[in-house]
Amino acid sequence: KSLVDRAGPRTGSVSAYCSLVLVLVQVLVLVHPAAGYSLDQEHSLEFSGPPSSMFGYSVLLHRHGAHSWLVVGAPVANSSSSPSVRSPGAIYRCSITAESRHYVLNCGKTCDAESDHQWLGVSLSRQPGDNGGHILACAHRWKNVYYSKKEGQNHKLPNGVCYRYANDLRHPQPIIPCYRDHQRKFGEDYGSCQAGISNFLTEDLIIMGAPGTSYWTGSVLVFNTSSGGMSVYLDDDAGAVSFGSYLGYAVGAGHFLSPGTVEVLGGAPQYNQKGKVRPTFVAICLSLGSYFGSSVCAVDLNADGLSDLLVGAPMATGITREEGRVHVYINQGQAKLLEAGFQLIGSDAYAARFGETIANLGDLDDDGYPDVAVGAPQEDDLKGAVYIYNGRKEGISPTPSQRITGSTLGRDLRMFGQSLSSGIDIDDNGYQDVAVGAFLSDSAVVLRTRPVIQVKASVALPEQIDQRVALCREHKTPTVCLNVTVCFSVRSRQFRGAIDLQYNLTSDLLHKPSFPHRFYFHGNGVTHSHVRDIFTPVKFEVSYNHRETNTHKASSKTFPPLKPILQQSAGHQNTITNQTWFARSCSLVNCSTNMQLSAQLVLPDQQQYFALGSGQTIMLKTSLLNSGDDAFLPRLTLRFPNNIHYIKVLQSCLTDGEVILISVAIYAFTASAIFCQLSSCFRKQRLYCVLPAKPCLCSSYLCRIIVCASYVKYVSLVDVCDWSCCANTASFM
């Protein structure tokens, strides 16, 4: 004859400048990565119980008046008041102060029934309420003993017992929901129902799991404290009932049909060896042996007034073994739960049993959506870990915002994450705190929640960048520039004090690798020319964080103040972007140009031909007219005989009325051609590109000299060259 057992390893302003052709990005501030998120790991509180008592198997934060308590279950602890009882278990009330004290809660006369190994403290729950409601503590292996005269022997029926404590943690009232005077047979009906292996309290309901009902088919027992009536929920799907399903292994309640109704949850992790959850709908896991339904949590993830559902499958196996999963179901209304397209997996670590426990933490990060904690108590060779997930408008983030282990707390803990509790603000800073049990090290830890700072940032840019308008001067040169204004607004629900923000502004994020950056920050002392890429938008990015802020006012007389954290918005990590465009004066979306090119050869003495040896220089005057929309990135290609070599652009031809030379840059050349980049934007105007070419005969070879505007570059010297013939040319360069 077996019993169900839960034990064991199972604001600022910045100016950026655009020179008519320049680019450089400068990082302003080094941003440090954010530390641990909502839960503070530096000032954790640890509580220890008797050795080998499994102290921490269940935990519960509780508050009554001005007093905050950590209630801890130690299901195999010995009783100091009844030394003859073997390992009955105990409930400890720990005062959360600088000097913690433990008190053992008395369970009353009912303990006089056989309480050996009853596992008092296997489950704990609290009635909701700001000032703390009743507490329920259960011992699912408590046995009802009766003597059969007919058989001449005692019979022990593991009915299970729960104790309901007042909010001052006194005057326990026993509840034995499975006791029946006529019950005599172990396993049959409620003879071994093991009530209380799990429990959950609402304002009016006491919900207890009884997985041993009817040969471990299981049931969920609901006691209405207002009417005094008891209801029993079995699996009413007659075709699906199977012995050993363990319905009631986990229980809960939520608002699934409507915000004004309460529906009860019951998990059956052994249903067909796959697992099942049954509120007003049925969820069945297809993974064999996953223990789907061994933990359940009803929580309104998307803040729509209806409860969504998280179901743990801690023995689900992925690549290795028993990594564990949590299934997510989003309420579509009227208890129509749609499973999300992903599962929560933690670190997907070997034998972690992620999903063993799930707890609703309330809104830790002030974004309006509840957050949850998931325990993986066997991760890292039974050391354990706890993962924090944040609720979102669409449901829940699939990635945890925080991972907490015993080592990150500086403590040697084992089975950390076996139990979780929240719902109470122990330090009066306006945020609910979290308790975590680690029963293999007989410990429990309380983690306080850090206050949240909400920062809204914006980047203001001009709508367009007009290259014709030079609003700034750089090195006494008119320069095209734009102002980038970064603004921050800061708000906190609880924190009061100065906030030290640091931010990093990056420009031109979308620049193409084949082009240089187009912008630089004022004062760099670096300039370029020829901005060629004017089609790609100019994108700016601001990432920000806060320096560690010293808090001067404690949140209570007992606890040191906690440093605030920045709220992490969904979709990005404190990063915003904005972009602007280069202005294009086009009548249509796609510019329609009308480029007309003419060229005239200017020979010495106005001759019609040029005889080799009759002179050293000839000129080619090119005229380019655009009578349509603005042309962007125009290029001019000139080809000439091999014995003529390009020298430079003459500046004397640039004052001919309205004729304007925007800029000329050689970006490629061959022995018989040059390729000029005229300008990034060629508007409705003429361009004269005058190119003198001087044949310089040097022992039948040529001196090759390439000149573009005022930039001179000696490209190559063919064989041996007589430089005397090039002296005049070199002098005027």
Where are these regions (language model features)?
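Conserved beta-strand/short-helix segments
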Residues: 3-687, 696-700, 704-710, 716, ...
